[in-house]
């Protein structure tokens, strides 16, 4: 395993051939059975957005695929019989899936090794909590209260496949790997026309790697230029020095602004800046003038258009003034709230009052959008009035109840950090009454008669799971009081928003 890892280590003096272990089975066997790369899983999870796709990866299937490739020589593809070739036909989607997944596994290794080397000597045991979605909000509470403006940026996707190939070319210098990579991309587009109407069965590992490499390239350039605006001779981002014609591209990019580069650096210089990215969006918080925040806005527009050749409209970059506007981020509406405090001070026989203003980040639930989502899924109407879920009446009573309890628990779990619980209680009320109406419709009864027959024990099911969790976190005296329902609670075990959507 050390030999394989040593082969994959980045070395500027030679070209990396990523396809070598793809065509030599002994290296595939090492990848399939050796657990030496398991120590990189934590590092890889930091590099990738979602690590849940590893559950669908089968090393045995990959081994059998490699054997069939050797026996049938399927990689020799005549261009005349491109559509008739069984490797590229409708029945060969499985082969493409596994080859693309295997290619992503191989290409991920050097990136994980290099990223893991940057974390040497640092403790990563607490990184699991940092992967939680809720871990972002305590950071925002601590930082955004001291800033004036927030730049909300929607990260664009490349509209042409060659942009993805060129992005990967900056880091992978092996021509054969890039040609194979381009082949996989274009074949995916050909198959997409046939399989777009069906449920997608493509493994997302390959495309998650593409997305993360695309975002990594954008962020590395942004941080590099950001560092140069504060420290002109900084060389902390050594990963950028291995690119092809990097300085030529940067020099061309800077001409977009003006020739007077020191003046631009002086205008963009801002030591008080914070950057957060999640789910295809990023926010840039700063404490400065509107002129500077507008310059950052057009910096992002020119970065995407000039460097990545992606048409990027300026309306995709929103400037929010926290004291006036709401920042919509990860399902919450955040804004700054001024809390006046009056302090009475006494010195000897004289007493006086001191007026203080405390700035606090207010996180609210977007009740309108949530009611719209519930109405779209037929839990209520557009006004928020609960209705019965007609499509669930064929299920058993316990199944219906468990579904509603799980949905209510997930929503309560995620929006426990809201500063105002009134909207959360309204959502719970909609789900509870929808559950009762669904059960009453199944038994062909009215809601009043159904509740009278079963009693109040039915609605207690919605409170059991959440109360058990909170009772383990807080002391009994604090839990028994009503203060618990007025505080914000951030959980550090919410890793995916899909868990809330799929109710798993």
Curated annotation (Swiss-Prot):
The keyword tRNA processing applies. GO terms for molecular function: RNA binding. Keywords: Chloroplast, mRNA processing, Plastid, RNA-binding, tRNA processing. One of its GO terms (cellular component) is chloroplast. Signal peptide: none annotated. It is found in: Plastid, Chloroplast. Its main location: plastid. Pfam families: Intron_maturas2, MatK_N. One of its GO terms (biological process) is RNA splicing. The keyword Plastid applies. It comes from the Eukaryota. Usually encoded in the trnK tRNA gene intron. Probably assists in splicing its own and other chloroplast group II introns. Belongs to the intron maturase 2 family. MatK subfamily. This is Maturase K. The gene is matK.
């Amino acid at each position: 395993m050390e030999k394989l890892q040593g082969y994959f280590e980045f070395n500027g003096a030679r070209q990396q051939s990523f396809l070598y272990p793809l065509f030599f089975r002994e290296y595939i066997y090492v990848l399939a059975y050796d657990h030496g790369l398991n120590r990189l899983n934590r590092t890889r999870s930091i590099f990738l957005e979602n690590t849940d796709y590893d559950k669908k990866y089968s090393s045995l299937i990959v081994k059998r695929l490699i054997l069939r490739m050797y026996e049938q020589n399927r990689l020799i593809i005549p261009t005349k019989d491109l559509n008739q070739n069984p490797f590229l036909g409708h029945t060969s989607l499985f082969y493409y899936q596994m080859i693309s997944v295997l290619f992503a596994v191989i290409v991920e290794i050097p990136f994980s090794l290099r990223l893991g080397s940057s974390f040497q000597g640092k403790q990563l045991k607490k990184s699991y909590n940092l992967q939680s979605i809720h871990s972002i909000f305590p950071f925002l509470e601590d930082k955004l209260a001291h800033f004036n403006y927030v730049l909300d940026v929607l990260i664009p996707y490349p509209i042409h496949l060659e942009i993805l190939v060129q992005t990967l070319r900056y880091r992978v210098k092996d021509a054969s790997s890039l040609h194979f990579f381009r082949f996989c991309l274009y074949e995916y587009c050909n198959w997409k026309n046939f399989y777009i109407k069906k449920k997608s069965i493509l493994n997302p590992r390959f495309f998650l790697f593409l997305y993360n490499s695309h975002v990594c390239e954008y962020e590395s350039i942004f941080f590099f230029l950001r560092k140069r605006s504060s420290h002109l001779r900084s060389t902390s981002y050594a990963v950028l020095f291995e690119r092809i014609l990097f300085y030529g591209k940067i020099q061309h990019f800077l001409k977009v602004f003006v020739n007077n580069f020191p003046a631009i650096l002086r205008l963009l210089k801002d030591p008080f800046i914070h950057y957060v990215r999640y789910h295809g969006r990023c926010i840039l918080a700063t404490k400065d003038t509107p002129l500077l925040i507008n310059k950052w806005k057009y910096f992002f527009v020119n970065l995407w258009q000039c460097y990545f050749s992606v048409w990027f409209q300026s309306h995709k970059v929103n400037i929010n003034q926290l004291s006036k506007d709401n920042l919509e981020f990860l399902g919450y509406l955040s804004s700054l709230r001024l809390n006046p405090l009056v302090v009475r001070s006494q010195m000897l026989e004289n007493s006086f009052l001191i007026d203080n203003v405390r700035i606090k980040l207010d996180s609210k639930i977007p009740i309108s959008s949530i009611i719209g989502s519930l109405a779209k899924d037929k839990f209520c109407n557009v006004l928020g009035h609960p209705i019965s879920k007609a499509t669930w009446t064929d299920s058993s009573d316990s199944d219906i109840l468990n579904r509603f309890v799980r949905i209510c628990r997930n929503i309560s779990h995620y929006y426990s950090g809201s500063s105002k619980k009134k909207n959360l209680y309204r959502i719970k009320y909609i789900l509870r009454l929808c559950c009762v109406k669904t059960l009453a419709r199944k038994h062909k009864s009215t809601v009043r008669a159904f509740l009278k027959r079963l009693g109040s024990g039915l609605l207690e099911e919605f409170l059991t799971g959440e109360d058990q969790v909170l009772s383990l976190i807080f002391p009994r005296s604090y839990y028994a009081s009503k203060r618990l329902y007025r505080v914000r609670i951030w959980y550090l075990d919410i890793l995916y928003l899909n868990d809330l959507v799929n109710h798993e």
